[in-house]
Amino acid sequence: MQTTIRGELVEPYAEALLSLAQSHNLADQFQQDSGLILDLLAASAELQEFLANPLINPDAKKNVLRQLTVDKVHGYFLNFLMLLVDRRRINLLAAICQQYRALLRKLRNIVLAEVISAVELTEQQRHAVVEKVKTMTGAADVELAIAIDPELLGGVVIKVGSQIFDASLRGQLRRLSVSLAQPV
């Protein structure tokens, strides 16, 4: 139930941010700005706790956000952050930024492909993954989110929405062990 309520709060703010971005031709700028915010939040658990703490004065939160984003985000985006503080919704900031990016991808017919690889992918391998995902989904473009997991032993696992394409050595070994365990 908490997730549903949170989703109902996040969606309107993300849609409002997208509407603002489109009306001022700032969709790409806001995508960069939201990426910066997501990076800041991911890098600092203290910042997350600070912004989520209802006992901390809203002006203190605004000052910290201004200091962190001065000359790094567009003024309209900064105003949006201040609005979230005023409305006591700043604790939803990461979810709103993620939803904004998802709405923008949907609008532009871009899919997000989460790629897990045993080693760092070369540019040629990245291109091959993008083309494979385009073929699988019919999307105009693909945004890659790449993670490294040495336990895969080799190959990649690609997740697009609810679809998973497992071309890893670990996955092949698992499928082989399952088939060998089947009675003849």
Swiss-Prot record:
Signal peptide: none
Designated name of the protein: ATP synthase subunit delta
Main location (coarse class): membrane
Functional summary from the UniProt entry: F(1)F(0) ATP synthase produces ATP from ADP in the presence of a proton or sodium gradient. F-type ATPases consist of two structural domains, F(1) containing the extramembraneous catalytic core and F(0) containing the membrane proton channel, linked together by a central stalk and a peripheral stalk. During catalysis, ATP synthesis in the catalytic domain of F(1) is coupled via a rotary mechanism of the central stalk subunits to proton translocation.
Top-level taxonomy: Bacteria, Bacillati, Cyanobacteriota, Cyanophyceae, Synechococcales
NCBIfam families: ATP_synt_delta
Membrane-topology annotation of the record: Peripheral membrane protein
Thylakoid found in the keyword field: yes
Subunit-level organization: F-type ATPases have 2 components, F(1) - the catalytic core - and F(0) - the membrane proton channel. F(1) has five subunits: alpha(3), beta(3), gamma(1), delta(1), epsilon(1). CF(0) has four main subunits: a(1), b(1), b'(1) and c(10-14). The alpha and beta chains form an alternating ring which encloses part of the gamma chain. F(1) is attached to F(0) by a central stalk formed by the gamma and epsilon chains, while a peripheral stalk is formed by the delta, b and b' chains.
Subcellular location: Cellular thylakoid membrane
Disulfide bonds: none
GO function terms (MF aspect): proton-transporting ATP synthase activity, rotational mechanism
Listed GO CC annotations: plasma membrane-derived thylakoid membrane; proton-transporting ATP synthase complex
Family in the record: Belongs to the ATPase delta chain family.
Pfam family, one: OSCP
Keywords recorded for this protein, A-Z: ATP synthesis, CF(1), Hydrogen ion transport, Ion transport, Membrane, Thylakoid, Transport
